[in-house]
Every structure is written in C-alpha cells, then in structure tokens.
C-alpha cells in the first residue's frame, strides 16, 4: 500500500495573512494557495521551475490596485510579486518563488474598438488569436505574429516585446502599442502614451502621478541620447527590456514612456490594459514553398528571397520536417510539400507575399519563380523545386505546421530533448549564414542533435539543442553552451534574445551594454521599483541594490525529475515528457483539446497541469522510499485483505486528513478521458493513460466510489439488461430512481436502453448473420465481400438504431456484413483504473479478434 503524502511546502504565515486580508479588502478575483494550483504555475515553456507562494487572479484594474496597495503595509513590505500572462515564455520570465499575479483568467475583455482610427483597447489577458478573431469581420488585425498565438496573451507579448514571422515589415509588439494603463508597486495607476517632447517638462498633459517618472526618464534619455544610439546593436530585433533608444520617435519630437514598459517582463509595473494599433488584413496572399536538398542551402539562399521584396522568409530544417511527418498535422500539408523518395526535402524556405494589390503580388511572385526556375535548370543553390499556394486554407495549414514545429521538437525520441535556452539569437541578416555555421560547429563539437527553424529575414534562427538535464554532466554542458553562444552573438554584433525576452538569461545582460548604459537600466528599475519587488531577478536590479539576478542554472524541472527513479519515469513517461509548450491552453473553443481546461479556466485541469501533478506525485513517492516495483501496475494488485485498511484511510480522508494524492485525484476526476491530448498535443502526452495508472494506485489506499464499479461493470451487465429494455427503462425513468442515483452516485441523465433491442431491430431488416465456424469454409471471393463489424456497448445497447442502419447500409453497398458477437473491450475499466481487470479483458478481446 502506498504512503500518505503530507510533506509538501506550506505557506508562510505572512503570505497567509496577506491573502486573508486581501480577501477582506473586497478583492473580486480568485485566490489560490493549495499545492496543486501552485504547481500548475511553477513552470512556463522553459526548462525552469519555481514554486510560487500563491496565485492571484484579478478581475479588474481595481483588483490589481488592491493587490499593490495592501502589499505596501509594513507587515508585507518584503513580499514580492510576478505578473503572468499565458505562461508561454521560454526563459522563465513569468515564474518566481513569490506571489504570482495571473491576468489571463479573468482580464480577457476587448474594451473598445475604433474602426476609423484603427485601434483597439484590450485587457492584458486577451489572447492574440482571440483579438484577431474578433477583428476579422472588420477587416483589421493585430500584426505581430508568434508561434504560440492561440494561447499567448497580449500582456505577455507586451512584456516580452514579442515578434515573429513578418517582423521585417510589421516590426515588434512595441511598434504597435499606442498606450498602456499599468499599476505601479505603490498602487498608483500609470497611464502612458506618446506626448510632445516640448510638453514633458513644462505642460505635462498626463495624470500627475506619472509626472516624475516621465520627466526624469525623459531628461536621462535626452542627455544620454548619443551614446544610446551609438552603443546599442543596430538590428531589426532591437534590444528589449527598458528600450532607452525608442522612447523618442525619429525626429525626437515625441516621447513615449510606453517603450520603457514594453519588454520589461513585469519588472516595472503590472500592465493591465493596452491601446493597440491595427492594420488592414491583406486581401491577397501567396506562399512559395521552396524545397532544398540541404538546410545550409536553404539558409544561404534566404537573403536572395528577402531581396525579392518578400513579406517574410521562414526556414525549416530536416529534423523539424521529419518530426512533422510523424505527426497528424502532416496529412494537412503533404500535398503542398510533395517530395520524391530519391530527393527528400532537407531544407525549406516558406516565402510569403501579401498586400492589397493583386497585380503587384503576381508580378513579384512571377519574377521570383522565374529566378528559381533558372537556378533549378542550372543546378544552383541545391534547389529541388517549389510549390505555390494562394488560397487562405492552404496558407494557414502551412503556417500551422510551422507553428507546431516548436512543440514537435519536444517529441524527439530518447532522454535528450531539444530544449529552449539559446533559441532566439539574432545577428545582422548578412552575417546569419556564417554565424549559424559557427553555431553548428559549436554544437557538433559536443555531438549534440538539434533542430533549426526561424525568421531568417530578420536574422533570427531558432535552435534547440537536445539535452537530458536529468544528467548532471549535461547540465554543465547547458551552462557551457549558454556562455559560448552569448560570446558568439557578441562577436557577430547580435543579441542572445532576439525574440523571446530575457528572463533568466538577464544573467548575460551586462555583456550587451556599455557600463554606462547598464547603470541607466538599473536607474530605470530604481525609479519604478526601488525595493526590487516586481519580478526580482529579471532584466536588472535597482541601482544601489545588492540583489542579484537569477543564474542561468536557476532551479529547473529536471532538478525535481532527477529525484524520480528512471523506471518510474518510464512507467509514467506520458507525464514526464510534457515540456510545457502549453498548446492545451488554446483559447479557441472549437479546438478539441482540452474541454475541462476551457470550461474551468483552471490550468490544474489541463494536460500540462495534470502532468505536473503526476510528476510531483512520483517525486514525493520516491522521497517516501516507494520503489519502482510498487508503481508498476503489472506487478501490483489491489488486494481484498487490505480492505479494512483502505476503509480506515477513507474515513481519515473524509475527516479532512491531508494527502497530496487527493489533489492529484481532483485534477484527474475532471478529465473526460477524451484522449484529444493523445493526438493534438505535439508531445502526445495522453493523460487518460497515466490517469488510469494513478487511479489504480490511489485506490490501493482508498476505497472506490460505488459509481466506479457501476461504470466498470456496464459492459458486463448491458447484454443482460438489454434482454428486458422496457423493464429497466421503466425503473430508470422513475423520479425516485433518478433522485437516489444522483444523491448516492452523483450521476444524472442516465441513458435509456434501446427499444426494441438490437437483435429485434436486425430481424426487422432481414439480417441473419453467420456463425464464426461457418466463415472458415467460405471461398476467397466470398470472404472479400465480408465486412466485420465490432460492437461496443454504447451503440449496441443504448443506440442500437445506429448499428442497424450501418448494417443495412453495408448490405445495400454490396457487402456481406458480419456483426461479431459482443465482447467487452474494457474501456470503462481502463478509464476508472481497474487495470488488472482491464488487462485480462483486453487480452480476451484481442485473442477473439485475432482468430
């Protein structure tokens, strides 16, 4: 029998008092402090993990003000806070061991739209694709693109100054932010927008509480203007995090403090609302998918595409393409990326033209295609062909494959997984090929596998080396590669963070600034957050502070995973392989993953959340000296002799005795076992599979509810009940029956058996069937027309008309349908964790079908 897990980190008294007092301050949002909630937000899309003290989910700007004002009471002055959006950051931006303020659950309102002036005002928790879905009927869109656009929030995009495909033309998020409403750590609301430079010092037009910040930073940036322009890298992906350069427009006639906040990663203020610039949706789009016999050829050929005035050029390597071919998404694009067996695609450039002038686009596409034809005819640049697509559905399918590539890399086989830590380096595009050649040589010298894809037009290529961070030697290599790549980007006049923000990589910040400018950044932090209470450890520390930035070797998920024996990790590899990509947070209600997450908006009830629960459950079990054999369901059985002890444990549970296993159970109970995660998640983590294993072990310690036995035995009972459907349906429809079942079993809307039953309905259509023994003597011609139909209990006994109609249809199509005898398949047993019974049932069914 497994032990009770009670040794989990507890809240300290000050945090507990703060949460209680906040509730009394009429805080309207949600407050979460149990271990499951804290674990669900302990990770993002990076390798890092830090357990927060608590999570706050404000519903309004007023709620955020309440959070900050209460935190300024003397008793709570040492508490720190980290704002959080979609949690899609790849460098630990939104995780910390403090109080997390998550704006993604409730602050999701689109507040105001001005179609004529082309702007929209939104709350920080609005998802990027959600906004564009709202804007599409008006012919407008928010331009910055990113691969996580279906779950990344606008607040998160602003805080990391996100950008992606098309940035050469559309720029970064900060280029489209017109104004912000933020809450400072002192509880004051700060409104920022562009103001005339002449008015900043004398006729200050904005709210008085922001005057000092505006004027001080204005003067400092004015005084340091020459060195700022001279010393910062001249890149399309300019330096994010307190953007000293772009606070002024080109002629310095306007000053905008908003540019300091964009890219600040929650280290200066809580960004709550934003006014965003919108663009017309291009009426016409064309993709040219150029295929190469090597990735290096695709890389070196990209500048040629950029010179052809393309909107964007995206490059993908063979590793990513091969992983895509193994995923369900390849079926949607294989006709758009055809290849010959003797000439496989080893590199791909996705070239897009877009605009409102069809003739101009056609001319550009024709010109590029003519040049490509010439190169192919001459055997130049290793081009093996190209394909065009101009219809929107095809274009969207290509980009969906490209976006999913990020997650697909995490599904590589083996313990070493491609991970993000040097994946968004940026160098001047003219140096990219040489830089990547040196980058690849560095990785090859360590015999590492890696995948590459990205925005070569902007000099950004995503590189994810494959490492197993459970191996301490590879953790050292992680640090070594980080250090070497940082030096390499400096050598080529680039940046370590061209797209995804700094996060923990702020550790390298000083390498990219002169000492003078680094002190200016620290001064900005001091002005906004002098006591280092907002997302401490990121971007920089306040001037005159002795605090330190996070190390590149900050606490990682692997530090916890390493405590779990390898055999346990293998047994629960579905949960262990989750890399945090967060596709299960997709806002779109039409995406099939994950129903419980969509309804509850609680990340505990998502595949990622459930995987995190099971990983921690395994770690705690290992720390209680539970052996791998005890968590191998093939070697364990729930014994009747333990019934008394299970009864005693269940009484203790009813009395409120804590066991972390109960929190895991609560997360698993809301899973519908629909298995959408098994196909839609790029990692294919398959929650129902490890959920069944967890239930098996959980109920070795605690009694099962009666409804579990009812559901598990349905397949066995249904054939007998179906012999008298009218009788059973009569009792099922009685109100007293429904009331008793709901109160005792928690089940409502019980289905009715089919009347007449399946056998009677088959007689009506003249189906006679054949015994299995008769089939063995049939000729090959007769067997070729046979169609075997395998029954399941739900259609055969509760929706028999479907089976009858299908049999009738196959007869009319000229087949000889054979309805196989019903045999339980054990699915219900598996869902409820009756694994021993399921294994026996599944084996019997398999032997029957393989006859």
Regions from the PLM with identified roles:
Residues 1-72, 76, 86-118, 147, ...:
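N-terminal flexible segment immediately upstream of the FAD-binding catalytic core
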Residues 154-250, 254-326, 330, 343-350, ...:
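Mobile "lid/hinge" segments at catalytic clefts and subdomain interfaces of large enzymes
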Residues 550-581, 585-721, 839-845:
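Ferredoxin-type iron-sulfur electron-transfer modules in oxidoreductases and energy-metabolism complexes
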Residues 2-6, 202-248, 528-595, 601-609, ...:
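Flexible inter-domain linker/hinge segments
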Residues 412-416, 645-824, 829-851:
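Iron-sulfur-cluster electron-transfer modules
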């Amino acid at each position: 029998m497994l032990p009770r897990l009670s040794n989990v980190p507890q809240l300290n008294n000050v945090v507990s008092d703060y949460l209680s007092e906040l509730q009394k301050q009429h805080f309207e949002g949600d407050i979460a402090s149990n271990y499951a909630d804290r674990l669900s937000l302990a990770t993002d899309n990076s390798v890092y993990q830090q357990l927060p003290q608590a999570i706050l989910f404000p519903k309004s700007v007023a709620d955020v003000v309440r959070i900050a004002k209460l935190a300024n009471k003397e008793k709570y002055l040492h508490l720190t806070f980290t704002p959080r959006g979609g949690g899609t950051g790849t460098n630990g931006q939104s995780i910390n061991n403090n109080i997390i303020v998550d704006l993604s659950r409730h602050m999701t309102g689109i507040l105001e739209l001005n179609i004529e002036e082309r702007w929209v005002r939104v709350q920080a928790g609005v998802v990027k694709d959600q906004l564009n879905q709202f804007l599409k009927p008006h012919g407008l869109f928010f331009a910055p693109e990113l691969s996580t656009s279906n779950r990344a929030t606008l607040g998160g995009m602003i805080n990391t100054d996100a950008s992606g495909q098309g940035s050469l033309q559309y720029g970064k998020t900060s280029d489209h932010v017109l104004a912000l409403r933020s809450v400072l750590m002192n509880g004051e609301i700060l409104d920022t927008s562009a103001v005339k430079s002449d008015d900043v010092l004398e006729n200050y037009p904005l709210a008085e509480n922001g005057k000092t910040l505006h004027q001080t930073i204005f003067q400092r940036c004015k005084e340091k203007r020459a060195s700022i322009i001279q010393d910062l890298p001249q890149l399309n992906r300019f330096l994010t995090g307190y953007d000293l350069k772009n606070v002024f427009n080109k002629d310095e006639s306007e000053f905008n403090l908003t540019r300091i906040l964009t890219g600040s990663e929650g280290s200066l203020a809580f960004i709550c609302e934003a006014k965003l610039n919108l663009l017309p949706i291009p009426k016409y789009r064309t993709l040219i998918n150029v295929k190469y016999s090597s990735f290096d050829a695709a890389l070196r050929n990209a500048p040629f595409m950029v010179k052809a005035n393309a909107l964007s050029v995206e490059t993908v390597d063979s590793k990513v393409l091969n992983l895509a071919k193994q995923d369900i998404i390849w079926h949607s694009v294989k006709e758009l990326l055809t290849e010959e067996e003797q000439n496989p695609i080893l590199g791909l450039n996705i070239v897009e033209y877009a605009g409102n002038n069809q003739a101009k686009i056609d001319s550009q596409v024709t010109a590029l295609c003519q040049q490509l034809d010439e190169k192919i005819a001459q055997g130049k640049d290793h081009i093996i062909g190209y394909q065009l697509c101009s219809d929107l559905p095809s274009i969207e399918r290509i980009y969906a494959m490209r976006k999913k590539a990020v997650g697909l890399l995490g599904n590589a086989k083996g313990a070493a997984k491609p991970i993000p830590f040097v994946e968004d380096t940026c160098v001047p595009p003219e140096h990219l090929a040489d830089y990547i050649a040196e980058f690849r040589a560095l990785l090859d010298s360590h015999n590492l596998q890696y995948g590459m894809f990205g925005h070569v037009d902007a000099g950004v290529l995503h590189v994810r080396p494959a490492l197993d961070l459970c191996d301490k030697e590879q953790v050292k290599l992680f640090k070594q590669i980080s250090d070497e790549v940082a030096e390499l980007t400096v050598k080529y006049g680039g940046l370590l963070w061209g797209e995804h923000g700094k996060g923990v990589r702020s550790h390298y910040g000083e390498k990219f600034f002169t000492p003078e400018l680094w002190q200016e950044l620290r001064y900005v932090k001091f002005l906004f957050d002098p006591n280092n209470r907002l997302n401490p450890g990121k971007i920089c520390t306040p001037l005159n502070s002795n605090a330190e930035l996070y190390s590149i070797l900050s606490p990682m998920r692997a530090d916890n995973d390493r405590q779990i024996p390898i055999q346990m990790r293998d047994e629960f590899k579905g949960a262990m392989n989750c890399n945090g990509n967060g596709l299960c947070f997709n806002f779109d209600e039409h995406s099939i993953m994950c129903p419980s997450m969509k309804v509850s908006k609680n990340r505990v009830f998502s595949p990622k959340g459930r995987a995190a629960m099971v990983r921690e459950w395994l770690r705690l079990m290992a720390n209680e000296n539970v052996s791998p054999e005890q968590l191998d369901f093939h070697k364990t059985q729930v014994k009747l002799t333990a019934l008394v002890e299970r009864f005693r444990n269940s009484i203790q549970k009813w009395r409120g005795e804590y066991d972390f296993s109960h929190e895991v159970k609560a997360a698993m109970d809301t899973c519908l076992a629909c298995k959408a995660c098994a196909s839609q998640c790029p990692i294919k983590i398959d929650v129902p599979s490890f959920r069944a294993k967890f239930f098996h072990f959980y109920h070795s310690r605690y009694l099962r509810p009666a409804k579990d036995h009812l559901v598990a035995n349905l397949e066995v009972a249904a054939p007998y009940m179906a012999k008298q459907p009218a009788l059973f349906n009569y009792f099922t429809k009685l109100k007293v029956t429904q009331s008793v079942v709901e109160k005792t079993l928690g089940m409502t809307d019980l289905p009715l058996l089919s009347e007449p039953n399946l056998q009677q309905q088959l007689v009506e259509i003249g189906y006679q069937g054949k015994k299995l023994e008769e089939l063995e003597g049939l000729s090959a011609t007769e067997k070729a027309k046979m169609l075997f139909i395998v029954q399941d209990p739900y259609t055969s006994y509760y929706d028999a008309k479907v089976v009858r109609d299908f049999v009738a249809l196959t007869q009319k199509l000229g087949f000889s349908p054979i309805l196989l005898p019903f045999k339980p398949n054990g699915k219900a047993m598996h869902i409820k964790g009756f694994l021993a019974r399921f294994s026996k049932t599944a084996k019997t069914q398999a032997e029957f079908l393989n006859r």
